[in-house]
Amino acid sequence: MPAVTRTTAVAVFAVVAASCSSGTPAAPAAAAAPVMKPLVSVKEMMRFDIDPASDYVFDAVQYDATTKGVSDIYPKTDEDWEKVKIGAVSLAENIYLLKLKRPWTPKGDVNNSTGPNPPELSPEQIQAKYDKDPVLWDAKIEALRNAALEIMDVADKRDVKGLFEASADLDMACENCHLEYWYPGDRAAVEEDKRQRARIDPSAKRSAKKK
């Protein structure tokens, strides 16, 4: 039988010792969280996402004023309530996407901010307002989300009266944000519109009182 050299014996011992080790293998490194990159501006987000979602709510509850009087429009079927829920869930989930840093408008779009007494703010003016008080921007977003959560709740309960009130809360949250960051110069026109609507729309009257 051939002799086993000292070097060979040491090598074999090392292999056996390694294979018998009771140590646990190192856990694989956790995958890095994906970086969320906004695709569109705030203005486009509103046009293609937030506004269409809110329309599911606003279109579901209305007061139709005619020469014959005022009639209520409200959800009557499961399908009607399903549409309200779709809008509310979309709003509640997607509104937080406005917290991601993104352009205020598409490239080259300056809103209606030129000429004498422009009704809308430019992207630079909006950014200046945000930089001055970023907490306020987050508060406006939270108000919108809370209104959406309220609508989700009344949709589950099939609460018609609650839906009229919740839609008024959503409308107020939207206008409060727009008057702060989009068209503060139109505040008088908006308030006049609210007064006119309140003449026939009890939910609008309730909204005006809460301001």
For the regions a language model picked out, list residue spans one by one.
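Bacterial N-terminal signal peptides that target proteins for export
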Residues: M1-V10
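Secretory/periplasmic and organellar redox-cofactor proteins
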Residues: R6, S21-G23, V35
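Sequence context surrounding c-type heme c attachment/ligation sites in exported
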Residues: P25-K85, V89-K211
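C-terminal motif of bacterial Sec signal peptides marking the signal peptidase cleavage site
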Residues: V16-S19
